[in-house]
Design a protein with these regions (language model features):
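Coiled-coil-like amphipathic alpha-helices with heptad-repeat character
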Residues: 1-4, 73
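A residue-level marker of the well-folded mature domains of exported/periplasmic proteins
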Residues: 28-380
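Bacterial N-terminal signal peptides that target proteins for export
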Residues: 3-16
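Bacterial N-terminal signal peptides
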Residues: 14-24
């Protein structure tokens, strides 16, 4: 074939690809088509409710540029989540579909997180995964993403909109679960320490509301003392120690994270062990397994940081034109006394700073500790 002919064909093919990308971007900007369910992967993508809509975006050619816009980073869960996202991006079946995976954490500054998302939109990313610092502050950037044909998938701290995809567990239901555990083990009510998460986030608000609505509805008398632990062991430990110093005694505890630190504060203060509804940190479960007979009667429930991988999978499937729910409901990982078993649902040989149950088998998502801990939490 003559060089001129080859060049002409190459130019023609480039033009065709450019046209396809242009048409795809324009179609994405129009938003998804609302279609009948089920989802393309119904065992993974469980709709939040019977009235949840199903989205079908126009298929876009890969490989894709996907970004993770995280906010707060200074706790074990967020660090493990960032590492998990990178581990998932390196799995062969996922890596082949990614041209680029970018991670940015902006701290508690909502404006900085929104600016990061705007930058990803301006840079032409195909999808952006978001752990929102404040769910109600994102309306303008959600509209910008839609206009640019960028798919937004929020997880954990989700977005207050039906124009993006949300992936989460029932955070309020988690608060209800913990409160019911205290109601069961404190038949006369009592004084409860509530260790909250990061202020302003939907997770903290939903869990808090679930706890209080359930305790209030029990008909028992409760005195709830609230402190802020930011889902972080050192912060939660200090907040608990300060609360014990002032209040002297608690009949029960519920904590959203940093639970290993909370129990350590009890031990340091020589406070009796009490019923505890908490998260899924390995260190917390170690304590629950070791001190059940001493009164540390635990309900350990939550969702592992691997939900970021479900959000990434959702974004890729949406870009490929597969049907997904607008709101995906993930299962909780629950272990309650007396069912704590070393080597099964906690691991004495592993670090305390590790969230157990970091898998979603129904989505084909699982990780070894080595896969996750071999990654860095730094921006990339």
């Amino acid at each position: 074939m003559k060089p001129t002919v080859r060049r002409n064909r190459a130019v023609t093919m480039s033009c065709v690809l450019a046209l396809l990308c242009s048409v795809s971007a324009a179609a994405l900007a129009a938003g998804p088509e609302i279609v009948a369910g089920p989802a393309a992967d119904p065992t993974c993508y469980v709709p939040w409710a019977s009235q949840t809509k199903f989205f079908k975006y126009p298929a876009k050619p890969g490989p894709y540029r996907i970004a993770l816009a995280n906010g707060f980073i200074a706790n074990t869960w967020r660090i493990q989540m960032i590492k998990t996202s990178k581990a998932y991006a390196e799995q062969p079946g996922v890596k082949a579909k990614l041209k680029e995976f970018k991670v940015v954490s902006t701290g508690e500054d909502v404006a900085a997180q929104i600016a990061a998302i705007n930058n990803f939109i301006d840079s032409g990313y195909d999808a952006i995964i978001v752990n929102a610092q404040n769910p109600k502050a994102f309306a303008p950037v959600i509209k910008r993403a839609k206009a640019a044909g960028v798919i937004l998938v929020a997880f954990d701290n989700i977005l207050d909109t039906e124009e993006a995809i949300n992936v989460d567990v029932d955070q309020k239901g988690l608060g209800v679960l913990w409160a019911n555990w205290l109601i069961k083990h404190l038949p006369s009510g009592g004084k409860v320490l509530e260790v909250r998460g990061v202020a302003g986030t939907s997770v903290d608000t939903d869990r808090h509301n679930g706890i209080h609505e359930t305790l209030d509805a029990s008909g028992k008398k409760w005195d709830v003392v609230e402190v802020v632990g930011k889902w972080d062991d050192p912060t939660a430990q200090k907040a608990t120690a300060d609360a014990i110093a002032v209040q002297k005694h608690f009949d029960g505890i519920t904590a959203q994270g940093g639970d290993t630190g909370v129990v350590q504060a009890l031990i340091d203060a020589k406070h009796p062990f009490v019923p505890f509804g908490g998260e899924t940190e390995n260190g917390f479960r170690k304590f629950c397994g070791a001190h059940s007979k001493d009164g540390l009667v635990c309900s350990s429930a939550g969702t592992g940081p691997a939900q970021v991988a479900v959000a990434m999978k959702t974004a890729i499937d949406a870009l490929e034109g597969h049907v997904v729910p607008q709101s995906v409901k993930l299962p909780l990982a629950i272990v309650e006394d007396p069912n704590f078993k070393d080597g099964e649902n906690y691991y004495s040989s592993q670090s305390d700073n590790f969230f157990v149950g970091n898998a979603f088998p129904t989505c084909g998502i699982n990780f070894t500790a080595q896969e996750i801990m071999g990654q860095s939490e730094a921006n990339q």
